[in-house]
Amino acid sequence: MKYTYKISKVKISGDLMVFGKIEEEFKEFLESRRKYNEFIKNGLIDEDEALKLFKIDNWRDYLKLFDIASRVRDYFKKKIEITSTIHITNICHVNPKCLYCGFAAGTSKEGYYEPFRLTDEEIKKSAIAIEESGIKRVSCSSAHGYQGKEVIRALKIVKKYTNLEVLVNAGADLTEESIKELKKYGIDTICCNLETINENLFKKVKPGEELEDRIRVCKLVNKYDIELSTGLLIGIGESYEDRVEHLFYLKNELNVGEIPIMGFNPYKGTPMENHPKCSALEQAKTIAITRLIFPNIRITSPTPTIGAELVQFALFGGASNVATVIPKNHPMNVKGVGNPKTGNLEEVVKMIMDLGLKPKLDWRRYENYLKIYGK
């Protein structure tokens, strides 16, 4: 079906004429495919315009922002991806621990708390269950201290027994050799979130890590021509200027295929348990601005950070992937990295479809799954 351009009638408030410029540039792109590469390279906004959009503070401007970001998403992404999760181990050797972490053993009784390491059989059963639910993509995450060996182990098992697309996330705990090994076994995406590029803030909330180590891993992923996922953790004390600088660092210094936008959500028992939660609206705004900078990439919202019941905020903002979605047949008790609550598959699918969007699923498998596990 031909994509038709519609200019919204929402009134532009204040001096944010940036919306008019965005509308005109998007219209120009749609009417002239010859400018595709230039459009992708430059996006729809620059640093100053991004900062103006971060400072919007009324419903009219929010609606306008979400409208254009969603239309850009819909042009490039015809379906909304759904990514499930396998947590391989929470035995983390980072010391001292990240101040917000509720994933690592011993950090929060709301999280896993007790140490675990999945067996090969548990990884296999989890992957098969995820594929049988109709989900087509999985994230395999590991704590630090293994030089990538744990995610390599998981990748080999998942690829052997399923056709799932695989993202692995071990943060900075990857060497050049482990990245080469991941490529050898067919990795689709490697995630290494920078979280913030404000070095002082990074060191404050992640005292056991160095930002340089995460940047090094991102550059190695680019070096070996593997899709790179790297995102922002927002609401941890960064400024809007920090977010803009971070997004344009990704734009100008790295080749990024996926950006997760993760809002801070406090875990009880951690040093940041009393730090305010990042609202779903703030996350949606950040997603929308990211979409205008990166028109065609996968922008991800994990259900534990947006809030499992608030996924539609992320979709309003132009997200194209909902992550940490857990089917009822998953054999493990999965808890979110930013929040113990995760998204239920059937509920996430309904939230996507209620907005007139199409989930990316193996529908035959999903329908069979519903016959067994549906309400």
Curated annotation (Swiss-Prot):
PROSITE patterns: RADICAL_SAM (PS51918). GO terms for biological process: biotin biosynthetic process. Its cofactor is [4Fe-4S] cluster. SMART domains: BATS, Elp3. CDD domains: Radical_SAM (cd01335). [4Fe-4S] cluster binds at C92, C98, C101. Pfam families: BATS, Radical_SAM. Residues 78-302 form the Radical SAM core domain. One of its GO terms (molecular function) is metal ion binding. Keywords: 4Fe-4S, Iron, Iron-sulfur, Metal-binding, S-adenosyl-L-methionine. It comes from the Archaea. Transmembrane segments: none annotated. This is Uncharacterized protein MJ0785. It comes from Methanocaldococcus jannaschii (strain ATCC 43067 / DSM 2661 / JAL-1 / JCM 10045 / NBRC 100440) (Methanococcus jannaschii).
